[in-house]
Amino acid sequence: MPETPEAPTLEPLLTWLAANLERPAPVEELAARVHMAPRTFARRFRAETGTTPHEWITGQRVLTARALLEDTDLGVDAIAVRAGFGDAAALRHHFSRRVGATPHAYRSMFRTKESP
């Protein structure tokens, strides 16, 4: 019996998404990038990552914001743009939901841990 070729992984798309978090990423456009129908793409994405495209992207944006809060002195507005949230209100909303602290409080806690 001939082997069925495996479907290509979404890894190249995930790498591209992680490098382009500041860009909008509608499911329709992401699906088109990998030559899939949006519903097929959404199912495949969940199968490979365990979550929806929107939740995965938001998680990556929060990770980026955390790193910027820990490693830079950038303001929350600048971090929001760099992480792909667009504005500080969106950053605060998503960050607080996922981390359990505001960006300002997180930075303060992180900096307090580093102090001698």
Indicate where each model-derived feature is located.
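Short, Lys/Arg-enriched, Trp-marked, Pro/Gly-tolerant hinge/linker segments that flank
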Residues: 1-19, 28-34, 47-52, 59
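Terminal helix-turn-helix DNA-binding modules in bacterial transcription factors
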Residues: 24-28, 47-88, 108-116
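Residues within the alpha-helical elements of helix-turn-helix
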Residues: 33, 82-83, 98
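The short coil/loop that forms the "turn" connecting the two helices of the helix-turn-helix
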Residues: 36, 85-86, 101
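Key DNA-contact positions within bacterial/archaeal DNA-binding proteins
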Residues: 39, 88-89, 104
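Short hydrophobic/aromatic patch on the recognition helix
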Residues: 41, 45, 90-91, 95
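Nucleic acid-binding interface residues in structured DNA/RNA-binding domains
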Residues: 63, 75, 96, 101-102
